[in-house]
């Protein structure tokens, strides 16, 4: 279907300024790479998401969903069809020890809201840069905590635009994975069950984790965080470091000198630079140690022609 027609129609469904054509997706990822989206939309509520899905299904237009782009590489050829950004779906409510957070809310902000209400259980998330939806998608975690420990249920939207509530068991959580990598559900909101705690103790733990993160991670450069999952009985960063790969650069992307588990965009790198460096690191580590590193970061989109 003609993308100009898609743009025109969706402009009548969403608020002014929330539908764009040929939007550069590098502006919507932490690593600052990615080509153009044919049509880029940023809905503000569930009804608008349903309208987009209904329209896309009617005309067989592919739809790709983005959170805040913290753990994704979008290829240099961009994304065909409709790209839906969920960054405006950000509501958070607190009732007793329960927090309900919408998909586009930053998980860091949710952890701070928990602190404000003297609730413990989300301290580990105080340095995770992703959205709530992304955190559920990959069962995000850090410093011994992970989303699956505190999630009780979630509201999702099916590929037909139907709303469903899923219990935690349906997520099939594992280490940095969930069922959402293999189905077409869109995570809309999550319910977290926390415990009452002491404000000063919660804050002290968050301050400690923030200090560790800032002292060990290359936050001064664009990155996607940890590139690889932790292999059994080992650490990806240590294997990469012991392979002598810190500082290895392809194009504008290099293995961080500060933390070997990170790859940083130091000089206008491209998605292809990033992908090539990932493959080089995987090949080198496997040759030296016999360990095949598994990607944690998602790669989506089309290659540049």
From Swiss-Prot:
Cofactor: FAD
UniProt domain FAD-binding PCMH-type: residue ranges: 33-197
SUPFAM superfamilies per record: FAD-binding/transporter-associated domain-like, Uridine diphospho-N-Acetylenolpyruvylglucosamine reductase, MurB, C-terminal domain
Catalytic residues (UniProt): 176, 226 (proton donor), 296
Enzyme Commission code: 1.3.1.98
Molecular function terms, GO-annotated: FAD binding; flavin adenine dinucleotide binding; UDP-N-acetylmuramate dehydrogenase activity
One Gene Ontology cellular component annotation held by this UniProt entry: cytosol
InterPro entries, per database record: FAD-bd_PCMH, FAD-bd_PCMH-like_sf, FAD-bd_PCMH_sub1, FAD-bd_PCMH_sub2, MurB, MurB_C, MurB_C_sf, Oxid_FAD_bind_N
Function: Cell wall formation.
NCBIfam families: murB, PRK13905.1
Name listed for the protein in its UniProt record: UDP-N-acetylenolpyruvoylglucosamine reductase 2
Organism from which the protein derives: Bacillus cereus (strain ATCC 14579 / DSM 31 / CCUG 7414 / JCM 2152 / NBRC 15305 / NCIMB 9373 / NCTC 2599 / NRRL B-3711)
